Amino acid sequence: MSRYRGPRTKIIRRLGALPGLTSKILELESGYIGQSTPNKKVSQYRIRLEEKQKLRFHYGLTERQLLKYVRIARKAKGSTGQILSQTLEMRLDNIIFRLGMSPTIPGARQLVNHRHILINDNTVDIPSYNCEPKDVITVNNRKESVIIKNMDSSRKPKVPNHLTFDSIRFRGSVNQTIDRECIDLKINELLVVEYYSRQV
């Protein structure tokens, strides 16, 4: 399954707020946003599916990519759900988004694909690059205007504790692996792991 490129408001109307997908916030209308129809029984499969979709759309992943991350998390020591979330949070495109250099993760991915981003003074054009503690993220000097425009037009997010951002020098630092408590996406990773339990 390819990466979703359709209307983003359609997704958040169904699944609820996904800050990585879009900065738009929908007001609760006569219908519902991210909620099941009242008095309608929802199957466990659908609940797991929706949690999986939240994760996939928020981080902008294909089905194959998300399955790969689940397999990696299952092989690692510790809580599979927590490791899954931490691994996704340490992707380069997500780090750029969390630093406030782009209003969305798709926008951050575009910055990386266009070779605007450097890690430890080396150009990196792989959005899925796994950032590690002590990594320093900077912007190609010729493209600082793009970052300035992004920062002026987007909401000013609070930079999480595992990151540091110098808005004067456009320089971000990874201090440590993110703690699960600092991930602002409301999701039950265990349900995602259960959804894929027969495929891994």
Curated annotation (Swiss-Prot):
Q: Which UniProt keywords apply?
A: Chloroplast, Plastid, Ribonucleoprotein, Ribosomal protein, RNA-binding, rRNA-binding
Q: Which GO terms describe its molecular function?
A: rRNA binding; structural constituent of ribosome
A Pfam family found in this protein is Ribosomal_S4
Localization, per the record, is:
Plastid, Chloroplast
Q: What does this protein do?
A: One of the primary rRNA binding proteins, it binds directly to 16S rRNA where it nucleates assembly of the body of the 30S subunit. With S5 and S12 plays an important role in translational accuracy.
Oligomer and partners: Part of the 30S ribosomal subunit. Contacts protein S5. The interaction surface between S4 and S5 is involved in control of translational fidelity.
| Name recorded for this polypeptide | Small ribosomal subunit protein uS4c
Give the originating organism. Answer: Pellia neesiana (Liverwort)
